[in-house]
Amino acid sequence: MKNIKLSALNLVPIREGQEDKDAINDMVTLAQALDDLDYERYWIAEHHNAPNLVSSATSLLIQHTLEHTHSIKVGSGGIMLPNHAPLVVAEQFGTLETLFPQRVDLGLGRAPGTDMMTASALRRDQHNGVYQFPEEVEQLQQYFGPSHQQAYVRAYPAVDKNVPMYILGSSTDSAHLAARHVKGYHMFLQDILLHNK
């Protein structure tokens, strides 16, 4: 049993009778407990326009959690790439990796994590992110790559940073993309369990 590496995902829910700050405090308290139990990873989700969740500013919650834990890896489960410019994601996670070396994970999803009106408000450029997801994953890899392989636009301080990237998904397309480009693939087990019933 000691060889099994355990991880957790937190959507940062606001429980009945709680305020936003209470949910964030609970998020940190859980992370600290899991850190003490030698969990390997603690990931925080990204959701927008969800009144019962406080996980819209994922990178800020990751930083806050890293500041209050010692060794557990903290990351996104995941950053919904259609909502963000890859340059900004690389800059944010490059900064996190600079502040907390070898403790940051970058999980990426291709869904917007919200309804279409909110997704449109997040990316006003009429971005078609679901279909551009593979190219945007490649852009992220470029931004984290070695300085001698960078283009004119560079994502400082992400250059030369080794931030592990994971693809989150439930399809073979996502699995193939992960096999070609990133460290790992995470599949939501509920999809498998419901399919087998």
Question: Where are the regions a protein language model picked out?
Answer:
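Aromatic/hydrophobic pocket-lining residues that form the small-molecule binding cavity
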Residues: 23, 27, 58, 89, ...
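Glycine-enriched alpha-helix->loop->beta-strand junction motifs that scaffold or abut catalytic
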Residues: 68-71, 100-102, 179-186
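Active-site mouth loops of central-metabolism enzymes
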Residues: 10-25, 79-86, 159-169
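A conserved active-site cap/scaffold subdomain adjacent to cofactor or substrate pockets
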Residues: 173-196
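Hydrophobic faces of well-ordered beta-strands that scaffold small-molecule active sites
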Residues: 6-10, 42-44, 74-77, 104-108, ...
